[in-house]
């Protein structure tokens, strides 16, 4: 019925193959590395705080020097990202439409974690939580918007 033997289904027989293990095939160039947790970022709109005492957290990445973690504060990205979650950020200065990013805006360096949307000649910083409003940045104000990186993963700490 299944074109196999009972021994194979019971794990008693496994044919030898030249196919690499799934982990090698898909994650071979990635390494488990300690990535620094460099501070906090508001899920709302507020300050990006850099502090030294947050420690490190493991992540499976290709180029660990180009990543950092931030502790998320606030509830504007709920229900998907909670207060206290860790956001793994890839350092880069551009984002694709729809990416989650850590963005710094304004003269005082206000930092936030939001979905990045380009609409015509403006950028929309979009929260997941419908209780919060989008922030639309246009014109001259776009000169005050800086991208710190793209959020590639979040994880909850219990």
Model regions and ranges:
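Short, positionally conserved secondary-structure boundary motifs
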Residues: 7-83, 96-97, 107-111, 118, ...
């Amino acid at each position: 019925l299944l074109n196999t033997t009972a021994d194979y289904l019971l794990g008693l027989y496994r044919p030898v193959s030249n196919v690499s293990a799934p982990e090698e095939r898909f994650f071979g160039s990635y390494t488990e590395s300690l990535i620094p947790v460099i501070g906090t970022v508001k899920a709302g709109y507020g300050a990006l705080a850099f502090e030294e005492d947050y420690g490190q957290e493991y992540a499976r990445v290709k180029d660990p020097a180009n990543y950092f973690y931030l502790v998320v504060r606030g509830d504007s990205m709920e229900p998907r990202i909670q207060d206290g979650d860790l956001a793994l950020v890839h350092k880069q200065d551009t984002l694709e439409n729809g990416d989650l990013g850590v963005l710094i805006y304004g003269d005082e360096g206000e930092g936030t974690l939001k979905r990045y949307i380009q609409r015509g000649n403006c950028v929309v910083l979009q929260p997941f939580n419908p209780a919060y409003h989008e922030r639309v940045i246009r014109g001259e104000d776009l000169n005050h918007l800086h991208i710190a990186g793209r959020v590639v993963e979040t994880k909850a700490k219990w």
